[in-house]
Every structure is written in structure tokens, then in C-alpha cells.
Amino acid sequence: MRLLLICNYRPGVGGISGQVEIMQKKLREENHTADIFSTKGSFFWRLGLFHRLRKVARDYDVLHIHCCSGWGFLPAVVGVTVGRKMKKRVVLTYHGGGGETFFDKHPKLVHHYLTRTNTNIVLSGFLAKIFDKHQLPYTIIPNIIELDDTLFRQRNVLKPHFICTRAHEPLYNIPCILRAFQKTLTELPESTLTLVGDGSQHGALMQMAEDMGVKNVTFTGRVDNSEIYRYLNESDILLSSPTIDNMPVSLLEAMNAGLLVISSRVGGVPYMIKNGNNGLLFESNNHDELAKKMLWAIENQAVAMTIIQQAHRAVKQYRWESVKDQFYSIYGIHS
């Protein structure tokens, strides 16, 4: 089978691009042709996307589009239009936590393209409810993660070494983490916080930390996705505080590496994490509650360790082998 994966692709950044890279690797390992067509580029470069995709797509059986809201919907516009015209099998995976706002704002646009695919895939029950609301067809297949037991580190003692691997963009609400960490430092002055990544707020966040006088904070700058596990291995607790989200792979990576995950209770996250079972949840933008969860984790080591073990077991459902048959059925591959 020859498959073309279409998205706003950038190598080494994780997110949607990371998912596409994993899919390409797994499909190639099973002797299928799997290539990536990126719709990312300047405005003028994107004007030629339809023509370029028509030339490329003729050599493929399936177009698998990965899209989200805003400009992230461009792969759907280009991929569905070309795929339908060329009578290709068109599969679309919708990512991102901003789907509800985008669908409500652009119902005709969304309906036009998402009713012209062969199959729509959503990652969790969170997006499934939005698709139901707009009477759009879908099937649920979660994000996938490459599991490797060598990446898991058993921690005998949970230390107050915190990490966040989310991009420094407004929707990820890193200021909430800085405020919570400042409160944690008053109780646990040996605490450390590593903020991995960059983004439009990177400079402002560094300035905020300086203005607040927060100590023991490390800003790494941009890190290639292949290096993420090195930073996770040096930490014990992952913090995530977005105001909107869907099914973040960063949380799965942390569970896979043996960290305790503390996340805001938004979007699709509660479909992944059950509070007190395989992670801890707090109300969005509530840095006081986040700080309490951070302190609780250090003060309740035995329970926290049990949560980590349960999370590590739960993450196995997101491996390629668990969802491969669903993808093969959708692609029309007979294994």
C-alpha cells in the first residue's frame, strides 16, 4: 500500500509532526510506502499547494490528512479537494483542543470538508462529542507513542524536580506553572523547574521569572523531540497547564518515562488521566491548586509511586500494535 501523510509538517518538533513521523516509521517497517507531504510554508508558497499535491498524489493509494484548527485546517482543504478529484481514499485525523470554537465559528467550512472524506479519526471522546454536535462521522483512535522499556526510570524517591515540555505559547499557560513553582519553593527550597522548549512567549517568560525572583528555573530553549527523554530522565514530575488541549503526547511521553503527571483538567485530558489513578488534575489556571498538588506528590510518596506505576501500565494502550488493525481496516490493507 502507498500512503501519503499530509500535514503542516516540521521535523523534530513533536505534536502532529511527531505523530506523522511515528506513523511513517511504523508503516515503512511493515513494507508499505509512506511519505510526508508538508503544507507548511509562506503564503505565496502555499498558493501552489493544490498543483504540487496533484502531481505528488498520483503515485499513492491513500491520502491521510492530519489537521487542526485555524491555519492547521489547511491540510484538510488541500488534501480533501485533491483527494476527491483524483478519486483517492481520503482519511483525516483531527487534532487539537480548539476544535469546538473552530467548528462553531466555521460550521459550513468544516462540514464541507469533513463530510467528503472516507473516514474521519478523532483522538478521544472529547472531540467525539464535538463531531456529534455537528453531525459529522468519525471513529476514535488515540495518539500513538513509541514504547521502549529502557526509557522508563524507576524512581525510589520522588524528588521536587519539575519539568514542563509544552511550547511557550499563550494556550499552554506557562505563567501558571511559574506562579505555582514560586509557591512550592517556599515549602521546598530545593525544588527545581526545567522549562523545555521555546515559542512566542519565551522571552516574556524569562523576564517574568526574573521579575518574580523565582530561583532554580532553567530555560532550555528549543529542544529536538528526539532529546525530550533525556530531560524527562533528569526530572521526576511533569507539569502541564494548558487552557485548551486534546490528547497531548507530551503527557504520554512522561508516563512512559516514569514521571508523575500533573495537568490542568481541560479538553481531552480527563479522557487520558483519571485524577488520583494515573495522574493528578487541577482546575485550569488555578496556580494555587497546582502548587498544592506539587507539594502533595512529594509528601505522599507511596501513593504517588502507585500512580506512576498505573500510568506506565495504562500507556501501553497507545502503542502502534494496539491500534494498527484499526488503521489497516481504514486504509483497506488486508494483513
Language model segments and positions:
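Conserved acidic donor-binding segment of nucleotide-sugar-dependent glycosyltransferases
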Residues: 275-276, 280-287, 296-302
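Conserved donor-binding/catalytic core segment of Leloir-type glycosyltransferases
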Residues: 4-5, 153-185, 193-198
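Nucleotide-activated donor-binding/catalytic signature segment of Leloir-type glycosyltransferases, i.e.
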Residues: 206-223
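Short hydrophobic beta-strand element within catalytic cores of glycosyltransferases
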Residues: 260-263
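A short, well-ordered alpha-helix in the C-terminal region of glycosyltransferases
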Residues: 289, 296, 303-317, 329
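Aromatic "clamp/platform" in nucleotide-sugar-dependent glycosyltransferases that forms part
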Residues: 243
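Short alpha-helical donor nucleotide-sugar binding micro-motif in glycosyltransferases
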Residues: 222-223, 230-235
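Donor nucleotide-sugar binding/catalytic pocket of nucleotide-sugar-dependent glycosyltransferases
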Residues: 115-151, 220
